């Protein structure tokens, strides 16, 4: 879906302990908005933070009093190597950056992120810590619009050249972020098509599998694009 993000920033970061709350006041245009605190967990072992939300002094929907924001993780170094020559997955640690995690239905029944409805004007959103403390710096609102048809989007590609260079391969086992600690890189040497591959040793060469099967689990990769064009 196309999007328009709006960050409502605090004058200074605030640490919310359990039961503490902070209120954001802002002007906004009419529409539906996905929302997320911009946060950092205080505990280095936290895998999520729990909070509730109120809009204009009211609970906006069932479940708004029990929301979860997922913590983002990065690899802490490169894969290790045993004395046998087999590789082990790198350990993970929390990202050093402020985190965003749009509110969602933990049951997975609702396939979209939760949304708040605002009319044009001034509104308030109150976020309350429900468990372990976290630092909050802003409220992120992302306006959701109707998704464009690909045929309409493609019309804007007229005259744009297709990329005809060497294939760009992004290895699955090397993401820059994931929002679930269980999404670790793994080894599978049963298929020679998987890269890298070693017939004698176990090497880290993929990510996901059975661990990547829950709604809203996310993995982010990064790659260098050599030139403008269609890929």
Each model region followed by its residue ranges:
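Extracytoplasmic
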Residues: 1-231
């Amino acid at each position: 879906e196309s999007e328009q993000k709006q960050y409502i920033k605090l004058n200074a970061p605030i640490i919310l302990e359990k039961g503490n709350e902070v209120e954001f006041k802002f002007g906004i245009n009419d529409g539906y908005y996905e929302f997320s605190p911009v946060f950092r967990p205080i505990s280095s072992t936290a895998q999520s933070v729990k909070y509730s939300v109120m809009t204009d002094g009211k609970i906006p929907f069932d479940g708004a009093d029990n929301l979860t924001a997922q913590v983002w993780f990065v690899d802490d170094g490169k894969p290790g190597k045993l004395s046998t020559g087999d590789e082990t997955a790198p350990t993970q640690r929390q990202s050093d950056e402020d985190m965003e995690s749009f509110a969602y239905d933990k049951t997975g029944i609702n396939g979209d992120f939760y949304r708040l409805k605002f009319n044009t004007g001034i509104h308030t959103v109150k976020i309350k810590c429900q468990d372990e403390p976290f630092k909050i710096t802003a409220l992120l609102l992302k306006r959701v619009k109707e998704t464009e048809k690909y045929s309409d989007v493609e019309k804007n590609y007229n005259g744009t050249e297709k990329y005809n260079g060497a294939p760009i391969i992004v290895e699955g086992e090397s993401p820059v972020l994931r929002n679930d600690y269980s999404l670790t890189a793994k080894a599978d040497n049963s298929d020679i098509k998987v890269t890298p591959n070693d017939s004698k040793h176990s090497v880290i060469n993929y990510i996901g599998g059975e661990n990547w099967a829950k709604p809203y689990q996310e993995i982010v990769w990064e790659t260098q694009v050599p030139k403008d064009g269609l890929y």
